[in-house]
Amino acid sequence: MEKTSMFSIHEGKPIRCKAAVSRKPGEALVIEEIHVDPPQAYEVRIKIICTSLCHTDVSFSKIDSGPLARFPRILGHEAVGVIESIGEHVNGFQQGDVVLPVFHPHCEECRDCKSSKSNWCARFADDFLSNTRRYGMTSRFKDSFGEDIYHFLFVSSFSEYTVVDIAHLVKISPDIPVDKAALLSCGVSTGIGAAWKVANVEKGSTVAVFGLGAVGLAVGEGARLRGAGKIIGVDLNPEKFELGKKFGFTDFINSTLCGENKISEVIKEMTGGGVDYSFECVGLPSLLTEAFSSTRTGSGKTVVLGIDKHLTPVSLGSFDLLRGRHVCGSLFGGLKPKLDIPILVDHYLKKELNLDSFITHELKFEEINKAFDLLVQGKSLRCILWMNK
């Protein structure tokens, strides 16, 4: 049997399937039957095998005003699937390929995509509000009443089937377990890449990571892979400290136990003047200031991964900048999805990269609201939701 034959019955036609739909802000997702249209030019339709969720999904499910408050919507942006059907002008992909949908675009054609200096995509990355990458607000999802459902970050993986533009698609080796591969769609890649590509952490260097969620722990894993000599984790939750050891963390600071001392002062004392690299993974301006102050004068580098939901301006000392400290942002860890995710997959297959420890729970897709609760309560790092288990 050809590997495409299992998909041919639905090719070119709408598919009925289950999806978890976010109907109203702050309310539980609703499992319902939807229709997923066939892919158009430069798109593929994917059968999702498994998906996970991160705090971005939780945050967007609660937004109740402004342009980001769109309902009904299918959330989800970390997943692995198999290509079910292909639209016109799709090159490099075929039915049956195992693929990773990624929120960050990589068109491979614009100036930035061709440059080694950036992972920005000048062609597509400025638009994160449309439903489909090349067709604006046109939706590929309809509910049982024929009403459109909004997409999310060009992925929408909380559905048995979804339609994704090839600029957001990475073909991966079928040898990697799909639950581990799903982690590379967003948070874990973001953290590893920040240490690997953005900071370019050197062997024997010192690192401080502020916030030990999945992204922060992944920064530690990336720093470990690069051979960092000391990796300091900063968090309010002491339970994260034991977990952090699995990802290479050597030292921990509970910020509530610092007394009158600033976190940056404690770090400077521990390292003899400050760390070579610091990473802010929470999104608090005050924490960014501390991360910046914790680095060495003359060469210290601070990488910003957290997003302040209020977009508050940050004030940094001009004299500190003048004396050689650096600060930079990091979107998706500086990774070019189509080039760098396969490299991370290869590291995992060679048993060099720890992905297994990020998965703390596995549930059926129908239990998705339980997964949300676990994440909000701080009991889950990454929960894998299986579509057909």
Curated annotation (Swiss-Prot):
Keywords: Cytoplasm, Metal-binding, NAD, Oxidoreductase, Zinc
Binding site for Zn(2+) 1: 54, 56, 77, 186
InterPro entries per record: ADH-like_C, ADH-like_N, ADH_Zn_CS, GroES-like_sf, NAD(P)-bd_dom_sf
Stretches assigned to coiled coil: none
Cofactor note: Binds 2 Zn(2+) ions per subunit.
UniProt catalytic activity: a primary alcohol + NAD(+) = an aldehyde + NADH + H(+); a secondary alcohol + NAD(+) = a ketone + NADH + H(+)
Domain of life of the native organism: Eukaryota
A GO cellular component entry from the record: cytoplasm
Top-level enzyme category: oxidoreductase
Cofactors demanded by this protein: Zn(2+)
EC numbers: 1.1.1.1
Gene3D superfamilies: Medium-chain alcohol dehydrogenases, catalytic domain (3.90.180.10), NAD(P)-binding Rossmann-like Domain (3.40.50.720)
Molecular function via GO: alcohol dehydrogenase (NAD+) activity; zinc ion binding
Binding of an alcohol, residues: 56, 77
The keyword NAD is assigned to this record: yes
Subcellular location: Cytoplasm
Oxidoreductase as UniProt keyword: yes
Coarse class of the protein's main subcellular location: cytoplasm
Annotated NAD(+) binding sites: 56, 211-216, 235, 240, 305-307, 332, 382
Binding positions (Zn(2+) 2): 107, 110, 113, 121
Similarity comment text for this entry: Belongs to the zinc-containing alcohol dehydrogenase family. Class-III subfamily.
Subunit details: Homodimer.
Protein name: Alcohol dehydrogenase-like 5
